[in-house]
Amino acid sequence: MPVAKIVILNWNGAEHLRRFLPSVVAAAPAGVEVMVADNGSTDDSLGVLATEFPSVGVLRLEANYGFAGGYNRALKQVEADYYLLLNSDIETPEGWLAPILDVLEREPDVAVVSPKLISWTDRTKFEYAGASGGFID
């Protein structure tokens, strides 16, 4: 299996972490590390990670660098064949990652893969990019 790391950018998302991170941790295959890059949170995000999710790696950024800036700084500190970037308000089911890694391994010309995002409030509907709260199908 290739080295893959799930990196979740967080800013003041303690409640999102409590609600959604358990599914990400539970669905991560053996050998895939889950990491949270904290974008200078001022809430209890770091405390929640330390006490409730001790197996999750934490990258502490000293300020809120925004979405792109936060991920750019975080990914400079992570080594992997594949980086799986998730928002902090995403729930993942068992088996969501295998098809993604399979495509990346089989198709060397593919650089980016995204699963379908299903609405958190109505799982019969597709969620658009940029919306908040989802479920990976």
Give the label of every model feature segment.
Residues 3-5, 33:
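Cell-envelope/extracellular polymer assembly enzymes that use nucleotide-activated donors
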Residues 23, 38-47, 63:
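A conserved acidic beta->alpha catalytic loop
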Residues 23-31:
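Short, acidic, metal-binding catalytic loop of nucleotide-sugar glycosyltransferases
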Residues 69, 76, 91, 98-137:
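Acidic/His-rich active-site region of diverse nucleotide-sugar glycosyltransferases
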